[in-house]
Amino acid sequence: MNVANTQIGDWLGLHPLATEDDILRIVEGRLPPSVIKRLAALGLERSEIDAVVIPSRTLQHRRSRREKLTIEESDRVVRFIRALSLAGSVYGGPERALAWLRKSHPRLDGRTPLSLLKTDTGARIVEELLIQIDEGMFV
């Protein structure tokens, strides 16, 4: 069982997610809008949720119509949780991880890691940077 995947499931309030297939299944099944409250509980601010996951107005629309998030929005939720989990393992917990995600970084042309999580490509860059930091290749 992958510890990061289990943590993703815990943070989303879902059954333990053991594999990437489990994560794919929940993304394709579309997450409920209630997971956004969990992101806020983890410390993500509303403006950050708007920028990285789903705009407030769209979220309000989904809730009023009792719709699930789209596959793309669900994927963005998982993308953020995955980055937070990895940063937490590198920096020692979600609070420090969020602080790192919010701080501009020279390797990212002065952008914040959080701002790169809007896209899959950006998330991969953030993950690679975290792996390099963890292995002592870059600080």
Task: Label the model's feature ranges.
Residues M1-V139:
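Non-transmembrane "mature" sequence context
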